[in-house]
């Protein structure tokens, strides 16, 4: 599909009329560093989809790579299915994150992406994005930066699971989530967990019981307050010390 064909298809589609110029997540997403003309060209190929409902899948493992997806709002989890048929969560993605890079090598997705709450995404046709990036060095550089961030987060996750104990893993997860919300202009002190404790345990290699016990311990120690699904950071410094300053990029 050419850029012009996609532009016509996008115009005919029912979407949400927000543009890259107006998006508050632009500094975290693909448009970062582009000038006004380049931003217009990128904006022309993007399709804004209707809200994705909780539990709905954006893509499945084995689906051909057609697009990357920039998250405008909400939370998306990525996961794979093990040989035993069990779900293994590989990441939680927030507004400003771009997902779908896993499909570039084999031209098909290697994981699943599912909404944890009502979410909005921008669909970016990969072939046209690749064509545009050939004429826009800043765009290509930003795509490479985003891919590099994925590699770095995978490396940090391996380190977290192999070298950290249960307390350190959960502390790193909460601290990182707080920082990510803060980077997006939200409160880094108080936020809602859109993922279940089972999801968190799956991601960190811990049981649900361990997650619940540690949350209670953190609360008694004055690190956090837990109010249902809401987390309030009471002592960010001590939480970071417990985490060992593990970052986990995504």
UniProtKB/Swiss-Prot annotation:
The keyword DNA-binding applies. SUPFAM superfamilies: cAMP-binding domain-like, Winged helix' DNA-binding domain. It holds the Pfam family cNMP_binding. GO terms for biological process: anaerobic respiration; regulation of DNA-templated transcription. It comes from the Bacteria. One of its GO terms (molecular function) is DNA-binding transcription factor activity. CDD domains: CAP_ED, HTH_CRP. Keywords: DNA-binding, Transcription, Transcription regulation. Residues 164-237 form the HTH crp-type domain. GO terms for cellular component: cytosol. The keyword rRNA-binding does not apply. InterPro entries: cNMP-bd_dom (IPR000595), cNMP-bd_dom_sf (IPR018490), Env_Response_Regulators (IPR050397), HTH_CRP (IPR012318), RmlC-like_jellyroll (IPR014710), Tscrpt_reg_HTH_Crp-type_CS (IPR018335), WH-like_DNA-bd_sf (IPR036388), WH_DNA-bd_sf (IPR036390). Regulates anaerobic growth on fumarate, nitrite, Fe(3+), TMAO, DMSO, thiosulfate and sulfite, but not on nitrate nor Mn(4+). Possesses 4 cysteines which may bind a metal ion (possibly iron). Monomer. This is Electron transport regulator A. The lineage of its organism: Bacteria, Pseudomonadati, Pseudomonadota, Gammaproteobacteria, Alteromonadales.
């Amino acid at each position: 599909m050419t850029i012009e064909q996609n532009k016509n298809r996008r115009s005919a589609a029912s979407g949400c009329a927000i543009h890259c110029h107006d998006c508050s997540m632009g500094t975290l997403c693909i448009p970062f560093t582009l000038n006004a003309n380049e931003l217009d060209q990128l904006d022309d190929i993007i399709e804004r989809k209707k809200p994705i409902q909780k539990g709905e899948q954006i893509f499945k493992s084995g689906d051909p790579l057609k697009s990357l997806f920039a998250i405008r709002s909400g939370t998306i989890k990525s996961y794979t299915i093990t040989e035993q048929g069990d779900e293994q969560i590989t990441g939680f993605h927030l507004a400003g994150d771009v997902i779908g890079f896993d499909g570039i090598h084999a031209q098909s997705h290697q994981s699943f992406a599912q909404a944890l709450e009502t979410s909005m995404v921008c669909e970016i046709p990969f072939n046209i994005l690749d064509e545009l990036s050939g004429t826009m060095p800043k765009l290509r550089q930003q795509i490479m930066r985003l891919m590099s961030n994925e590699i770095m987060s995978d490396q940090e996750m391996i380190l977290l699971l192999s070298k950290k104990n249960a307390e350190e893993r959960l502390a790193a997860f909460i601290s990182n989530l707080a920082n990510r919300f803060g980077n997006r202009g939200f409160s880094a002190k108080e936020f809602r967990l859109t993922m279940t404790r089972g999801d968190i345990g799956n991601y960190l290699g811990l049981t649900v019981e361990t997650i619940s016990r540690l949350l209670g311990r953190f609360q008694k120690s004055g690190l956090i307050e837990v109010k249902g699904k809401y987390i309030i950071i009471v002592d960010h410094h001590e939480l970071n010390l417990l985490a060992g300053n593990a970052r986990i990029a995504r």
